[in-house]
């Protein structure tokens, strides 16, 4: 049995968000008309954990009568601006060439419009850039150099996104001289083997950690961040932030932004900038986003 994105969101919404959104229930996926959804009694914002500190900014937009997508942007640009959040925006972990490349997408429920960018360098707020693609072009997605040029033309400043902390973490990864990279078969391949440095290979773990601790000290990684940096080398993170909003009118919007999989090959795009993979909003049903291994999510 195959499910459409609408069916998937409808089933998920009914199963896990009925209380928050005051849904009039359907226990099965829609087979024709969209399920009936009442507007919530109060506006609702959902976000990945790294957006929690910025929820008040989103609610401030909604309480002032602002648009749901503007509220989403207020939440997710917070982590993009934070140099200590290495999953998105400024300070995001770089690719294998030590270059930060960012992806984002957004969807506006009331107008059913969408915008997306992928592989963007030197522009911090790619969530806003995706929104600008939606509002000022006849396209849905721009990528790489074209997306960057469009951003500069539209007034986005050119910024160095690589912080010293992220650069040193990359250096720690590079200097381990290991096979912990993204060449070769992926997770879904029967030929895939976990690298020798994976956490579940205990016979190598303690010795490897000690060597990496010494190397981290030599590189200049702060002692309090040392183990976090080592963990990022051994288990490259795929951090993302998604945010979805619904107001009292039942209007919805959603967006996802990320610096992608750490140490990825240059030019790699995961699920985050892909409409229907990293984020999807259906005004008649609901809004959802994803985080984790983008390659696997795209195939679902």
Which role does the model predict for each range below?
Residues 2-4, 10-13, 17, 28-300:
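Alpha/propeptide regions of enzymes that mature by internal proteolysis
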């Amino acid at each position: 049995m195959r499910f459409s994105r609408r069916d998937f969101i409808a089933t998920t919404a009914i199963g896990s968000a009925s209380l928050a959104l005051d849904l009039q229930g359907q226990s099965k996926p829609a087979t024709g008309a969209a399920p009936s959804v009442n507007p919530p009694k109060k506006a609702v914002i959902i976000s990945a954990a790294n957006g929690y500190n910025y929820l008040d900014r989103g609610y401030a937009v909604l309480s002032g009568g602002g648009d749901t997508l503007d509220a989403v942007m207020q939440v997710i640009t917070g982590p993009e601006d934070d140099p200590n959040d290495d999953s998105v925006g400024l300070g995001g972990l770089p690719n294998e060439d030590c270059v930060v490349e960012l992806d984002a997408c957004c969807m506006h429920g009331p107008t059913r419009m969408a915008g997306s960018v992928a592989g963007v360098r030197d522009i911090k707020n790619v969530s806003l850039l995706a929104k600008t693609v939606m509002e000022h072009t006849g396209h849905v997605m721009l990528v790489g150099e074209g997306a960057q040029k469009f951003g500069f033309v539209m007034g986005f400043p050119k910024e160095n996104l690589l912080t010293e902390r992220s650069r040193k973490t990359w250096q720690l990864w590079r200097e381990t001289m290991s096979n912990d990279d993204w060449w070769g078969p992926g997770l879904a391949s029967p030929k895939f083997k976990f690298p020798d440095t994976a956490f579940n290979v205990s016979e190598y773990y303690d010795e490897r950690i000690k060597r990496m601790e010494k190397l981290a000290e030599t590189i200049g990684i702060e002692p309090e961040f040392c183990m976090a940096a080592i963990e990022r080398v051994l288990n490259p993170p795929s951090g993302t932030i998604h945010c979805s909003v619904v107001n009292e009118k039942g209007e919805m919007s959603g967006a996802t932004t990320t610096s992608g999989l750490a140490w990825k090959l240059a030019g790699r795009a995961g699920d985050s900038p892909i409409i229907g993979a990293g984020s999807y909003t259906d005004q008649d049903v609901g809004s959802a986003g994803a985080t984790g291994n983008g390659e696997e999510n795209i195939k679902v």
